Amino acid sequence: MCIRDREIGISIAGTRDGAPLLVMPYSEGLVGAPGRLHGGAIAGLLEIAAIAAIDATLDEPADGRSIFKPITVTVDFMRMGKLTDTFACGEVVRVGGRIANVAVTAWQESPDRAIAAARMNLAISPKPAQG
């Protein structure tokens, strides 16, 4: 997890179907319109869940991890985000040599009642050599 993830409180809460299950605890800084979770916070959670799913799929040592850069991101907002904890989990559809395709879902009360979903294509770049 990176600094941005910690700033909005995202952490790994466990696994779901073998993929990391992320939680974004509710905080006042995540409020958009009164009584609603900000769509940008939800989209950020979806992106981080996609990266976590890919990272868990790749067989890399911790010090040699790849860098993931979004190529295309499509987010569907299905329900209003309530002022409560939000969960997300990604499913890696395909990982190629340079591109990964991931489907991600975010929910609050039940995984069967998604508040948002995303399809993402991310470029996989090797970590730059330090020198």
Question: What do the PLM-derived regions correspond to, one by one?
Answer:
Residues M80-L83, F87-C89, V93-G131:
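HotDog/MaoC-like acyl-thioester-processing domains
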Residues M1-D5:
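Conserved small/polar residues in nucleotide/adenosyl-binding loops
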Residues L30, A52, I124-P126:
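Feature marks short, surface-exposed loop/turn motifs that line or immediately flank catalytic pockets
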